[in-house]
């Protein structure tokens, strides 16, 4: 598989996770999933940045992304050139990648609170990698991918995450550029 096709395949596969991770920034807010409670160390369990509404819409848009991918494959692409899981498969993949991404983001927030980092403070690699690693873990039992595809995702994800955060900051969707 040539590098360009591998890169496209990697982004195509993980797209529901990227969308699920971005949507809470736009549609989140409301009640935090930790209900404002503190952990044993006296700091918030997760913080105000991870909410029920953001989690719900993140997972929902991960599923919607999977559905859209299915129809794009059918209408515009050679089904042999990309992953062709069928509608049900794309719905399940969107759910697993979206849920995994948001669980990874929650875990990242939990770790940041243990490190006494406030919401919005930068934690290089932790901010960029937990969502992608857990998206891959959640989807892996049903959707195993070649090692080279997963390595590409781990390499490009910090770059994509950084770039998308700068765009969100410029659009006033985020308070900080990281």
Curated annotation (Swiss-Prot):
Lineage, highest ranks first: Archaea, Methanobacteriati, Methanobacteriota, Methanomada group, Methanococci
Any Pfam family hit: CarS-like
GO molecular function, one term: CDP-2,3-bis-(O-geranylgeranyl)-sn-glycerol synthase activity
Keyword rRNA processing: no
Cofactor(s) essential for the protein: Mg(2+)
InterPro entries hit by this protein: CarS, CarS_archaea
Function: Catalyzes the formation of CDP-2,3-bis-(O-geranylgeranyl)-sn-glycerol (CDP-archaeol) from 2,3-bis-(O-geranylgeranyl)-sn-glycerol 1-phosphate (DGGGP) and CTP. This reaction is the third ether-bond-formation step in the biosynthesis of archaeal membrane lipids.
Family from the record: Belongs to the CDP-archaeol synthase family.
PANTHER family, alphabetized: CDP-ARCHAEOL SYNTHASE
Full protein name: CDP-archaeol synthase
An individual GO BP term: glycerophospholipid biosynthetic process
Gene Ontology cellular component list: plasma membrane
Keyword Lipid biosynthesis: yes
Entry's EC annotation: 2.7.7.67
Location in or out of the cell: Cell membrane
The entry's keywords: Cell membrane, Lipid biosynthesis, Lipid metabolism, Magnesium, Membrane, Phospholipid biosynthesis, Phospholipid metabolism, Transferase, Transmembrane, Transmembrane helix
EC class (word): transferase
